[in-house]
Each structure stands twice: as C-alpha cells, then as structure tokens.
Amino acid sequence: KSPESLEGSKAVAYIAVADMSSAQWDIWSINDAAMEGTEDAFRTPSEVYSEASWPIVANAGFFYSSGGKNYSSSLAVRNSEILAYNINYASEDWVTMYYPTRAAFLETETGAFDACWTYRTWDNHYMYPSPAENTWDAKPADQPSATYPEGGEEFAARTAIGGGPVLINDGKFTDSYVEELFNGASGIGPDSAQPRTAIGVTVDKKIVL
C-alpha cells in the first residue's frame, strides 16, 4: 500500500507483482463478441474472487448497460477466445465519426507479453505497434486497416485485456490518451484524479498491477 501522500497529493494506491515463471494470469468477462449486448451479468471483483480464491483480483476495461443489456467497450480474450472487442468508433456529436485504435495488454501463445493498439473491422482484427493519429481537435484519421497505422498484423493472443490508454511502451513514456480519444466527450477524464487500474510487465516477466 502506498503512503498517504504521493507527489504531494493524497492517495490510496496498491501494487501487486506476480512472477509469471510460476504465477497464472487469467481474466473474466461477459461474452459480447458480437458487440450487440448480452444478458450475461456483470460480476464484481469480490464475486470473481469468491469462485476461485485468486490471490489478486482487479477490475479492468470499460463497460456499460443500456436497454436491459450489458456491453463491453474493451477487448477481452481468454484461452484464445475473443469475448469482447475494443470499441471501433467514437464521436462527440454523432455526426463526425472517428475510428480510434485502443490499447491492449496481451499474452501470446508462446508466453510472451506485449502492449499494443487494436482495431476491429467487419472482417478483420488488427494489432499495431503505435496508435492511429486521432485527436478531437482535427479531422478524423483514416479508418485503421492492414496498412494503417504502420506495422499492423492480424491480432492473436492467448489472454488479453483492453481499456487504455497505453502509459508506457517498450520502457518509454507514451500516454496515448489523446490518440485513443479518452479526453473530451469520452467522460473518462484521463487528466483528472479518478480511481484507476493499470497493468504492465517488466523485462523479466513480472506482471505489475
């Protein structure tokens, strides 16, 4: 647990470290792969913990309810099955449409870990080493594809969780909340003090929550 003050502000923060040479990382999510909403009930961290007594359970991703259905706005992959995708459009006025790439933290089939940005079209699901250059202050960037942003490849993961923004990538400060369109109309308030959860991995394969 953190001290009562961090960088001059009051804080209640916790950190947990898992050595992935012996630990297991898993997720739970509603199944909304069709992005049409589901009657699957959301679960609290306490409910997930009670089923398996995990040493550490943390909330993750973005989600909401509407019209009697539950929706996920963030990628979720478990045992190589995609349960939900990151959102693939956003707008401030529902006239001008943007197509943001959103963050993902994933484990590959070989046990390697990575942070990336993802986008799902109707026919394909891509992952990128950098985000699409979107900002609410400019016209929408091109819709992501196999060739934009550069370095795109077909998405593949054994386990993954979306949300965002990416804060650190390859050891460098990134914080792509502008490109991921988390400011402004999103209501996320990335530059304000709010409860947050973060996940990352060290070079020696220790997951940090």
Give the ranges of each region predicted by the language model.
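Short glycine-rich loop/turn motifs
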Residues: 10-15, 102, 162-164, 193-198
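Generic recognition of flexible, low-complexity loop/linker segments
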Residues: 45-46, 153-156, 184-188, 196-198
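Active-site-adjacent helix-turn-beta-strand microarchitecture at beta-sheet edges
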Residues: 66-178, 183-184
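C-terminal soluble interaction/assembly domains
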Residues: 207-209
